Amino acid sequence: MRIDAQSLIGPAIAALYLKDCFLLLGHDEAVLVRGWRGRWRAGFGLRDWQLRRREPYLCHPFKPWEPVLRLHWDAAAAPAAPPTAPAAFAAEPRLGPWVALVWLILFVALPAAFFGHLGLPAVLAVLAGLYATIAIALVRVWRARSAFGLSRSEFGVLAFEVLACAPYAANLVRRLSLHRAVDENLLAAAPRLLDVPALAAVHAGVAARIDDELDVVEEGSARAQALRAARPRFAPPEDNDAEAKDST
């Protein structure tokens, strides 16, 4: 069976893009994603399928304009005081439309021109539009680089990566948001940013990971005692009610 090299261009672009959407989270890490109209949601990696003891997490491949923040958490730590400042994320310079346009060119316009046999001029025109869009986005990043905490050298590396590998440019918003260090932990940020169902999902994820850690830590250790003391904070209300009835 002979494989045409040209037929691999589309899968290669998709693979590079998905690779850049892929995160490996520590057992004490999660992400906060800012979606439509500023609504936040949280995400954990896969508990049952790990790579090097890290949990795989795939950012939404069809929503590249959503900022993603990586946060740490420790269920056994004392609850953090309510923050006095907004979430630690600088307003991006309206990169969403440009990133969405890069995504559309890569996965709609370019395949249509290439596989639709529209001719070399059409393909070159699409590529010119793609790199013009990336260049405009990079100019906007350069002008707001201080808000993103980017030095000149860091911006240079970022610009080289997205120009050398255009699929990475579709993840420009995520690359910038993940670059920022967030000094607020998940358990402090979640009650402030998430609605009730999303917060309940975070509590369920934390509770499951507490149970996982209790299975491996030494029984009776200080860590185990701290985790057992913290566990009720993340249990569903009905579970706490049942425990209260059992104790009486």
Regions picked out by a protein language model, each given a short descriptive name:
Residues 1-34, 111-129:
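Long, highly hydrophobic alpha-helical transmembrane signal-anchor segments
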Residues 3, 9, 13, 105, ...:
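Weak global preference for isoleucine
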Residues 21-71:
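Membrane-interface amphipathic/juxtamembrane segments adjacent to transmembrane helices
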Residues 37-48, 133, 140, 225, ...:
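Broad hydrophobic/π-residue packing in well-ordered secondary structure
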Residues 74-187:
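Transmembrane helical hairpin unit
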Residues 153-248:
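Charged, low-complexity cytosol-facing tails and large interhelical loops of integral membrane proteins
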